[in-house]
Design a protein with these regions (language model features):
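Short beta-strand scaffold positions
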Residues: 5, 36, 81, 103-106, ...
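Hydrophobic/basic alpha-helical segments enriched in Actinobacteria
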Residues: 3, 21, 59-61, 78, ...
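Short glycine/serine- and small hydrophobic-enriched flexible loop segments
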Residues: 46-53, 114
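Acidic catalytic patch
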Residues: 41, 65-97, 105
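Short, flexible loop segments at the rims of nucleotide/cofactor-binding pockets, characterized by
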Residues: 11-13, 96-99
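Acidic, PIN/NYN-like endoribonuclease modules and their adjacent C-terminal/linker elements
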Residues: 2, 37, 88, 109-140
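Short, well-structured N-terminal submotif of metal-dependent ribonuclease cores
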Residues: 1-40, 51-64, 132-133, 138
Length: 140
């Protein structure tokens, strides 16, 4: 089964973060194909930008995170990664009134479901929603 990474994992992989070692250890232990969606890249970019604007990261560190992501300085880039364009065609479960889903979470879950991939996230709420919808979840 492939692994679909959401932004919480991407940030931990490319920015020094309290979760970085867990994310790196998880990927090292799982040789599966890694999928990153364009939506995940957008969320990653937004999160890095927010950290720069709030002073949690220097501008240089933010630019380095983008450069490293784009140029492949992580195991994520050893041919295991696949990029996926955004598709929101399978978001009907947003109308389920029994599951609390944020829009961004629903998009990540829909992409994972479409791929038949395990959703890899640190976000407990997203993980719970995915499980409720029958999507496999891996939490490092």
């Amino acid at each position: 089964m492939s692994l679909y990474l959401n932004a919480s994992i991407l940030v931990a992989l490319f920015v020094i973060d309290p979760s970085s070692s867990r994310a790196e250890a998880f990927l090292s232990a799982h040789p599966e194909i890694v999928v990153v969606s364009d939506f995940g890249v957008a969320e990653f970019s937004s999160a890095v930008g927010r950290r720069v604007r709030t002073g949690d990261l220097t501008r240089e560190d933010g630019q380095l995170a983008f450069c490293n992501f784009d140029n492949g300085s992580h195991d994520l880039h050893t041919g295991r990664r696949s990029r996926l364009p955004i598709s929101t065609q399978q978001l009907g479960f947003l109308r389920r009134l029994d599951i609390n889903l944020r829009t961004a979470d629903a998009i990540h879950i829909a992409i994972s479901r479409r791929l038949g991939a395990a959703l890899v996230t640190f976000d407990r709420s997203m993980a719970a929603g995915a499980r409720a919808l029958g999507v496999a979840v891996a939490t490092p």
